[in-house]
Each structure stands twice: as structure tokens, then as C-alpha cells.
Amino acid sequence: MATYSASDFRSGLKVMLDGDPCAIVENELVKPGKGQAFARVRLRNLKTGRVWERTFKSGETLEGADVMDRDMEYLYTDGEFWHFMEPDSFEQYQADANAVGDSAKWLREQDKVIVTLFNGSPLAITPPNHVELEIVETDPGLKGDTAQGGTKPATLTTGAVVKVPLFISTGEVVRVDTRTGEYLGRASK
């Protein structure tokens, strides 16, 4: 794997630090008037999600992480693992609850997702930014409910609960932003 010196660091670069794959979130190269230049770096551990700050002298190097983002299709869950398939090679991967995390509430069978692989095993799952899901349970809308007003909780087919306007009723398909969990609007037919 490639090695990167402190002057090569940039946001999004994936490196190995203390045996764990990390992504550089922020990078600032500091050149003081006296002394050696250094890089002040914010890193996010890809396994745990923890973010911390480290300082590297200009001569220090880090090894690149063997991390790849792949487009895959979500197949099914068997209760313990979530199964994904690469559409080109039909190779299948199984991810545990740590890798899937909060993404589980947005996954439907045959959805396209981005799977982050580390040494051939799934490390993280990223669902599409927007999904269209049907509402299976919500309070009934009453005559006179308008778009200007309050919201009510609605349960979607995947089990996720989002706040929707009062005029939305059970059985409707809505667009939801998976990053924030916010209602975006009714799905276009």
C-alpha cells in the first residue's frame, strides 16, 4: 500500500493509524516562522466513528488504508447479518449491525447502496441520500389540515419514524432525506 507524508495529507484521504483505518476530515499545514513545518489533522476512525486531532511533523508518513467504496445492491437481512451483492460480479458480502448502523432503517430490498470495504469485509453502509417509502401507520388527516402547520409522526415500511405534515395519510409514498431523517415531500408518481 502507498505511504503518504504529512505534506500529502488532504481531506477524504484514508490512512492506517494505530492499526485502524481512518479518514482525514480536516487538514491544516502549518509553517511556523521558526522550526519545522507540521500538519494539524482531524481524523475519523472508520471502525468506531470516533474523531480526534493529531499533529504530524513534515517528515512523518502514514500508510494508506486498503479501503474501497463500492456500489452494491441490498438483498436481504437474516436477523443477524445484512446481505449485499456487487451487480457486476454477483459477489455477495454480509455486514453486521456495527457496519450497517442507523442505515438499517432506510434499507429496502434491491436498493442501491455504497458499501465501504476494508480488507474485503464491509466496514460501513451508506444508503442513497433520498429514499421513497410508503407510510404504514399515522394518525388520520382531518378536513382543514393545511401544509402550514404542525407535523405528526408516521411509521414507514422499514420501521423508521419520520415527522410528516398533517395532511399526509396512511398508504401514501413519501420522499425522505436519509442523512437527516426529514420528510421532503410526496413521491412523484
Swiss-Prot record:
In terms of superkingdom, the source organism counts as Bacteria
The record's annotation in Pfam families points to:
EFP, EFP_N, Elong-fact-P_C
Residues where N6-(3,6-diaminohexanoyl)-5-hydroxylysine is found: 34
Q: Which InterPro entries match?
A: Elong-fact-P_C, NA-bd_OB-fold, Rib_uL2_dom2, Transl_elong_fac_P/YeiP, Transl_elong_KOW-like, Transl_elong_P/YeiP_cen, Transl_elong_P/YeiP_CS, Transl_elongation_fac_P
Keywords (A to Z) from UniProt: Cytoplasm, Elongation factor, Hydroxylation, Protein biosynthesis
Instruction: Using the record for this protein, list the coiled-coil segments as residue ranges, or answer none.
Output: none
Q: What is its main location?
A: cytoplasm
Query: Its Gene Ontology biological processes?
Result: peptide biosynthetic process
Q: What does this protein do?
A: Involved in peptide bond synthesis. Alleviates ribosome stalling that occurs when 3 or more consecutive Pro residues or the sequence PPG is present in a protein, possibly by augmenting the peptidyl transferase activity of the ribosome. Modification of Lys-34 is required for alleviation.
Q: What protein name is recorded for this chain?
A: Elongation factor P
Say which species the protein is native to: Saccharophagus degradans (strain 2-40 / ATCC 43961 / DSM 17024)
Taxonomically, what lineage is the organism?
Bacteria, Pseudomonadati, Pseudomonadota, Gammaproteobacteria, Cellvibrionales
Give me the gene this protein comes from.
efp
